[in-house]
């Protein structure tokens, strides 16, 4: 960027510290039970941050970041799962329309705008989203983020987790929570079967299930 805009070195300012004291980072091994771990974690966060509130306007919010839009690990399916199991108003946000969605044409763009506006207005407090969720959204009461899998890069983790704790006054004494759910790779045999061209379709499905692939 410095080169593109011909900015001299004297005008470049580099922060000495990149950490944010209002954020607390945690990496959890979900032992291959990612969905169950997510449900438990969201319940814990709701109990921690929203116990005793009388309205959505008082609530702290959370974002679950997913690597994909579709399938059971995508933001669309996870929003439905969280809503069903936890009895909460949970919505999803993605750049592209989910394959399962019935919205067509401009209706999906209208949906995305409403989801974003309602989230900023505290009309609901839990959102599942891909990285498409706008960096320009400055919502000050996000108390936790959860990455449903390893982020694409450390920069992505820092930017997405950084949606939390925007109001330093709210999170000085108790930092906002930023979680990453990961599964340690210990399924060498199952992976070998998946890549073996001689593996039958039924065996391929069994191996994929072991790895929680869909």
Language model feature labels by segment:
Residues 1-49:
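Interdomain hinge/linker at the junction between the two RecA-like core domains of SF2 helicases
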Residues 35-133, 137-214:
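C-terminal helicase lobe
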């Amino acid at each position: 960027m410095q080169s593109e805009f011909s900015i001299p070195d004297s005008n470049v300012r580099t922060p000495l510290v990149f950490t944010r004291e209002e954020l607390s980072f945690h990496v959890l091994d979900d032992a291959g039970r990612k969905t169950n771990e997510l449900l438990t974690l969201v319940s814990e966060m709701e109990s921690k941050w929203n116990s005793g509130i009388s309205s959505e306007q008082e609530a702290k919010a959370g974002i679950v970041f997913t690597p994909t839009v579709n399938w059971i690990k995508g933001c669309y399916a996870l929003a439905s799962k969280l809503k069903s199991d936890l009895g909460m108003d949970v919505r999803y946000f993605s750049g592209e329309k989910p394959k399962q969605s019935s919205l067509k044409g401009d209706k999906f763009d209208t949906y995305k705008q409403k989801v974003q506006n309602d989230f900023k207005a505290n009309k609901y407090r839990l959102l599942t989203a891909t990285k498409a969720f706008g960096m320009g959204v400055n919502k000050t009461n996000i108390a936790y983020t959860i990455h449903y899998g390893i982020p694409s890069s450390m920069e992505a983790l820092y930017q997405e987790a950084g949606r939390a704790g925007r109001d330093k006054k709210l999170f000085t004494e108790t930092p906002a929570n930023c979680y990453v759910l990961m599964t340690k790779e210990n399924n060498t045999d199952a992976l070998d079967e998946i890549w073996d061209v001689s593996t039958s379709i039924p065996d391929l499905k069994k191996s994929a299930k072991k790895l929680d692939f869909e």
